[in-house]
């Protein structure tokens, strides 16, 4: 789990055209991330029926978070044996004074 700094698909950035020739979206970065998924790890935030997966990162400049102009570059990957009850992005933690530019991804599991 953690800050992979890769937007796996164009849906994981607020405007794909704004990130052409930029970090976080290069074919090499996306391929490296895809290798982990091909090994059998699952992106626990992107579960069937869950709907859109929220962004986890917003630049501090120009009020990007308030406009929801962000990226999903933080992931929790797990094997199928982990039963995920829920997963969400804690946007409130990101709003705190001195907070990181990344919001925590919270995952509730049963073992």
Model-derived regions, located:
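Active-site metal-binding loops of divalent metal-dependent hydrolases
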Residues: 4
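Metal-dependent phosphoester-hydrolase catalytic domains
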Residues: 9-111
């Amino acid at each position: 789990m953690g800050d992979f700094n890769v937007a796996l698909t164009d849906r994981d950035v607020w405007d794909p055209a704004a990130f052409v020739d930029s970090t976080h979206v290069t074919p090499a970065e996306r391929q490296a991330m895809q290798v982990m998924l091909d090994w059998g790890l699952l992106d626990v935030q992107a579960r069937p029926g869950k709907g859109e997966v929220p962004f986890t990162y917003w630049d501090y400049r120009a009020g990007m978070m308030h406009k929801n102009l962000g990226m999903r570059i933080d992931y929790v990957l797990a094997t199928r044996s982990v039963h995920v009850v829920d997963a969400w992005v804690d946007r409130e933690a990101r709003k705190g004074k001195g907070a990181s530019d990344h919001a925590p991804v919270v995952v509730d599991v049963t073992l």
